[in-house]
UniProtKB/Swiss-Prot annotation:
The keyword Lyase does not apply. InterPro entries: ATP-grasp, ATP_grasp_subdomain_1, IMP_biosynth_PurP, IMP_biosynth_PurP_C, IMP_biosynth_PurP_N, PreATP-grasp_dom_sf. The gene is purP. Residues 131-357 form the ATP-grasp domain. SUPFAM superfamilies: Glutathione synthetase ATP-binding domain-like, PreATP-grasp domain. This is 5-formaminoimidazole-4-carboxamide-1-(beta)-D-ribofuranosyl 5'-monophosphate synthetase.
Length: 366
């Protein structure tokens, strides 16, 4: 793993008057580039050659500079990394960046300074490690089954990493699990039982609150020292299975798919905001204990509300999530913090800009 000191050494050679924001042209990049533009920062997009014309077609959300690659794996080449460093680029991780480049490669081989704490990708990328994080935080979570033989009620089986629900399946018995697991194996999505996590299926309403934590701003919640926590939006994900009611009886199996295809805006009853913020505080506090300096910047708690059990957290995405694309002009919650449109992409850019002004860029980079 590249030590933080080495990344900060690279950062120390940057011309901070010309810092640029960079990311892969995918996932939430349009929002990130637009946010940089609104904050007066230039941006760099790493784009597949065949995709460049389409990203150029968005005049207010295309990057100022394109770096064309044949595959996203090229991002790890010395040539590409040196080009990014020479442009004073701070990379913004998102789901596609993590999935296409790989959290292990980012930790071991990617020398370009990144916004936030890249150790979060290590803890996020493996569901067993992430479960340790959630348990340390003390937030309610679904039961995890150590063996398929223990399945005694409906479960959902998930793959590791940022796969957007691809390959997930539901089972109610060991026999059903092995049948569907074998199908995944034939498709090459899994190799062994170590590649999946078996999780209790919780009935309820899904909520995905988007948070931003700044370690350079003043405290705004008494239970959370050393920074400011903001709730900038909430979404729920539109999965293929959500459209099952539209299928003909002989097509029902085609809809039994948890692949995320889009996002829908949501607000919660105001009394529940305290629950969301309280659990977010626990997640941040735990992250500091487990992987100092802990969470920095955007993150999302993936939750289900069950009437008898309250909010249950089944996952944390320790980066900007695609659901924030709903709020490129701000959300109902962002206006409680800012008297101007504030997307998550813009909030990232502002944090970087303010860190440069205050001489604290090193506090938000790894």
């Amino acid at each position: 793993m590249i030590p933080r000191e080495r990344i900060l050494s690279v950062l120390s050679k940057y011309d901070e008057s010309d810092v640029k924001i960079g990311t892969i042209c995918s996932h939430s990049s349009l929002q990130i580039f637009n946010g940089a533009r609104r904050e007066g920062l230039r941006s760099v997009g790493i784009v597949l050659r065949e995709n460049k014309p389409y990203y150029e077609s968005f005049p207010r959300a295309s990057p100022d500079i394109f770096i064309e690659v044949d595959s996203y794996g090229d991002l790890l080449s010395e040539e590409t990394q040196e080009e990014l460093i020479s442009e004073n680029v701070i990379m913004i991780p998102h789901g596609s960046f993590v999935e296409y480049v790989g959290s292990e490669n980012i930790l071991e081989r990617f020398r370009v300074p990144m916004f936030g704490n890249r150790l979060t990708l290590y803890w996020e990328g493996d569901r067993r490690r992430q479960r340790k994080w959630l348990e340390d935080a003390g937030v309610p979570t679904p039961r995890i089954y150590r063996s398929p033989e223990d399945i005694d009620r409906p479960v959902i089986v998930k793959l590791h990493g940022a796969k957007g629900g691809k390959g997930y399946f539901k089972a109610s018995s060991p026999e059903e699990f092995y049948e569907k697991f074998s199908e995944l194996k034939e498709r090459g999505l899994v190799g062994s039982l170590e590649d999946v996590v078996i999780e209790e299926f919780i009935v309820g309403v899904r909520f995905y609150p988007h948070f931003f934590f700044s370690p350079i701003e003043g405290e705004n919640i008494a239970d959370l020292e050393g920074g400011r926590l903001e709730l900038l939006g909430i979404d729920r994900r539109l999965e293929v299975i959500d459209e099952i009611h539209r299928g003909l009886p002989d097509l029902m199996e085609d809809f039994m798919d948890y692949t995320v295809t889009g996002n829908i805006p949501v607000i919660v009853r105001e009394k529940y905001l305290v629950d969301l913020l309280r659990d977010a505080v626990k997640i941040i506090s735990s992250s500091r204990r487990l992987f100092y300096p802990g969470l920095i910047g955007p993150f999302c708690m993936e939750m289900i509300y069950n009437p008898s059990r309250g909010f249950i957290t089944f996952e944390v995405s320790a980066r900007i999530v695609a659901g924030t694309n709903l709020y490129t002009d701000g959300s109902p919650y962002s206006y409680y913090y800012y008297d101007e449109p504030m997307s998550m992409g813009r909030r990232i850019a502002r944090e970087i800009k303010e860190a440069v002004k205050s001489g604290s860029l090193h506090k938000i980079i790894y």
